[in-house]
Amino acid sequence: MIRLTISAAVAGIYLALSGAAFGADPVPLTVTGEVIDTFCYATAGARGEGHRTCGLACAEKGIPIALLENDTDKVYVLLPNKNAQPVPKGLVAKMGLQATVAGKSYRVGGSQFLTVDSFK
């Protein structure tokens, strides 16, 4: 019984450290939707052009932005396509407006992320 418990613990640690627990490889994806700030959307449902000024201020303070997909209402947290780089300012400037973002989609637990490889 002790061997089984130790084996299970070692396997769990291996999976956690190997990244296998994070799901499949990233998938290329293009999504069209509204650029939102995650705080105000999550806490108050704030979105649209009427929330644009506040959303821009939140993004400037470092609150992550996301893309609210048209038709499905899926929220993709937007990530830079290179480590330690910001999301492009031109995309942040589309706060409250429509944008199309192409990149790689990652799903971790119940969260969805999308790198910003290009946008329009």
State what each model feature region is:
Residues 1-6:
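Positively charged n-region of N-terminal signal peptides that target proteins for export
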Residues 7-19:
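Bacterial N-terminal signal peptides
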Residues 22-120:
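OB-fold and OB-like single-stranded nucleic-acid-recognition modules
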